[in-house]
Amino acid sequence: PAKEAKIWRGGQKALEKITLKKGLSSQDVLTLLSAEAYFDMMHLPLPQDTKGIMERFVSENLILHDEVGYSITELGALVFAKSLGDFDELKRKVVRVIVYKGKNKLETIREQVFDKGYAIGFESMVSWRNGQLPSDEEIGQALRKDARMYPEIAIRELVANMLIHQDLSEQGFPMIEIYSDR
């Protein structure tokens, strides 16, 4: 009932309206956000000057510009931050992947934290995580081939949905837990 009431109440500001850092220079913005990753992902040439980058970021609501300088929006930081840890409000939104030995949480084999903005860190997270998933080895006529127990596309979609649909007002890390059987 409490969660349902919260959903119906709504009233949360859009991510592109919430500012996390204010009064920044263009150089400060480029220190905190990855312009190279943005333009690469959008299949656009990287502008030759900082002004072109800032104009594009403003048009995409990744940053805002006013008389005191630039402000990074929560949207901009969440997807293109070089380090989410640079933003107090997002420190607990880094993705944690924990691999356990066996079928319970008694023994951790390894833990990896992915600190980059979700858009720029997603590929490396997917790659690392898929390397941790249980797999079998199929022997064909001449070659051996790794066969994942779970299709990569399904896991990729689950993780993307976890990140996109999380409640950012809730405390806690987005977490992926991997066990020997799942």
Where are these regions (language model features)?
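Active-site helix-to-loop segments that bind/position phosphate- or nucleotide-bearing substrates
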Residues: 1-182
